[in-house]
Design a protein with these regions (language model features):
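Gly/Ser-rich catalytic serine loop of serine hydrolases
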Residues: 69-83, 156, 257-273
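A cross-family glycoside hydrolase active-site/sugar-binding cleft signature
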Residues: 105-106, 137-141, 176-180, 199, ...
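Hydrolase catalytic cores
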Residues: 107, 244-337
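C-terminal edge strands of extracellular/lumenal beta-sandwich accessory domains
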Residues: 299, 304, 309, 397-399, ...
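Secreted peptidase-domain scaffold signal
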Residues: 324-442, 501-510
Length: 510
């Protein structure tokens, strides 16, 4: 029997979610709805004969596309394993959010359907729980060679990719997508703009901290270049946003045997279920009417900014200058974040292999819990906001405390591409046969500037990608003093008013 690795992936050697399960936090995702879409679905004990034992996976509901699940049909051990990572209530192999409500839809065999049916499944899951589903897990995808477009590329405009970006905005749900890996083959919808694409890590010295070799997220070189070039995003926009544990994860087979599995399929659900933990906390704050807390805490882009901004990059020495980060994350080439082009080039917000770093659910809680702060008054050293910025204008967040020299600042700005549904029958829903229209992405930039500066000429650090739906700053403060964060609406492509989420983490110079 293999060593039980799942607790390692949700404990402090992994995403450190187990700490949140226990007092004083007591967060397990209670009453929070999350979703799952893949080819098959988890089995439901008492309904499906193939589930011969009662796994501790309490599914809320299972579906076939946009209808009820067929008994003993589409039951798939892969889907069951992914569900287990999210919601297993088993004592031996607990999931990340054992209290969450999971809605799972099987889109069926690719032979009988394709992207339209997968879109239908995603829409159906997004509408469950009275339309209140906070995150949906995609641990599968569509190969480019099956895409009906001539000369199909990863440009964000495959039907399924457009569907995900449309649904993210329409249903306000965070899509978490397993990154492309190995020989490639499942790149659609990893070219989405509005979700989180996840690479997977393996353990190094007992800690999940190294991007594994099977991830396809390296810059293409050598003999495989032609194939791989088609399998990474067109242009400079990067696909991977975040990394999470995915190597040798212990899960249950349908018959109750424990097996070890690897891949981005098992990294993504760590992220999806972490949303449920944060959202249970958010609900608690709303119910007790806490100050600096609104329903904006439920927004998908707020979750995206919070998860990406709180990721681990470089282990803190104990002096807090690196924001208390718990591990140094390495790429396949053994380079860390400070050696990456993303660190050196303001036009590149994401490392091509690890995105902003490694998922840390406990740090995400520390990022989220200080609450929402508006630019109208000075803001605390850690927090987040959801607001709009007008074309050619900017929003300034003045940090209340002066920052410590040599300390790092982490800032993440997230916003969405606009995709419209070409709704032929005017029923406000996607139907097979309908299509979407890409209305593009507005260009926003992010700066850290001295508090008394009016322009961005003196910016200390910036993130100014022309193509990404995310800007991310991780940089050291050169001199102690007061600073402000500037969100700049650089260039209009669709609407003049752009909603955004912003998360920040700084070190005050006490």
């Amino acid at each position: 029997m293999p060593v039980l690795a799942s607790p390692a992936s949700i404990g402090e050697t992994g995403i450190d979610a187990q700490k949140l399960h226990e007092p004083p936090y007591n967060l397990i995702g209670r009453k929070i709805a999350i979703g799952q879409v893949e080819i098959g679905r988890p089995g439901q004990f008492g309904i499906d004969k193939s589930v011969s034992w009662n796994p501790a996976i309490a599914l809320e509901r299972v579906f076939f596309r946009d209808g009820p699940a067929k008994v003993n049909t589409d039951v798939d051990s892969h889907a069951g394993m992914v569900a287990g990572v999210m919601i297993s209530g088993d004592k031996t192999l607990p999931g990340v959010a054992p209290g969450a409500r999971l809605y799972s839809s099987a889109s069926g065999s690719p032979v009988e359907g394709g992207q339209p049916e997968e879109c239908l499944s995603a829409q159906h899951v997004a509408l469950q729980n009275g339309g209140d589903v906070r995150a949906i897990n995609f641990s599968f995808g569509e190969p480019l060679q099956r895409d009906p477009r001539p000369e199909a590329t990863l440009d964000g405009n495959a039907l399924l990719t457009q569907c995900i970006d449309w649904s993210a905005r329409t249903h306000d749900v965070l899509y978490v997508i397993a990154g492309n890996q190995g020989g490639g083959g499942i790149p659609i919808p990893t070219d989405n703009f509005n979700g989180i694409n996840v690479a997977y890590t393996t353990q190094r010295d007992g800690v999940f901290s190294k991007v594994d070799f099977a991830n396809l997220s390296a810059l293409p070189v050598g003999i495989g270049r032609r194939l791989i070039t088609r399998e990474i995003n067109v242009g400079p926009r990067r696909s991977i946003n975040l990394s999470a544990p995915g190597s040798k994860i212990a899960v249950y087979e349908l018959d109750g045997k424990i097996v070890e599995v690897s891949g981005t399929s098992f990294a993504a659900p760590h992220v999806t279920a972490s949303v449920a933990l944060l959202q249970e906390f958010g609900n608690r704050q709303l119910q007790s009417k806490q100050p600096n807390w609104t329903t904006d805490s439920r927004r998908n882009q707020v979750m995206r900014a919070v998860l990406l901004n709180s990721a681990d990059k470089i282990k803190d020495n104990g002096d807090g200058l690196r924001l208390g980060m718990t591990r140094t994350v390495l790429g396949k080439d053994n380079l860390n974040w400070l050696e990456s082009d993303a660190y050196k080039d303001p036009k590149i917000p994401l490392d091509i292999q690890m995105g902003t770093g490694h998922l840390n659910a406990f740090r995400a809680y520390e990022q989220f819990s200080p609450g929402q702060w508006s630019p109208e008054a000075a803001v605390p050293s850690v927090g987040w906001d959801y607001r709009t910025v007008e074309a050619k204008a900017s929003q300034d967040y003045v940090l209340e405390q002066p920052l410590k020299a040599g300390s790092f600042v982490s800032l993440t700005l997230a916003w969405e591409r606009v995709v419209d549904l070409d709704d032929k029958n005017k029923n406000n829903a996607f139907d097979v046969g309908e299509s979407f229209r890409d209305r593009g992405l507005n260009n926003l930039d992010l700066y850290l500037v001295p508090a008394d500066d009016n322009g961005t000429t003196k910016s200390v650090c910036s993130s100014v990608s022309e193509v990404d739906s995310i800007e991310h700053v991780f940089c050291p403060v050169p001199t102690a003093g007061r600073y402000k964060i500037r969100v700049q609406y650089r260039q209009q492509v669709n609407e003049a008013s752009q909603p955004y989420a912003l998360a920040w983490w700084t070190v005050p110079a006490q």
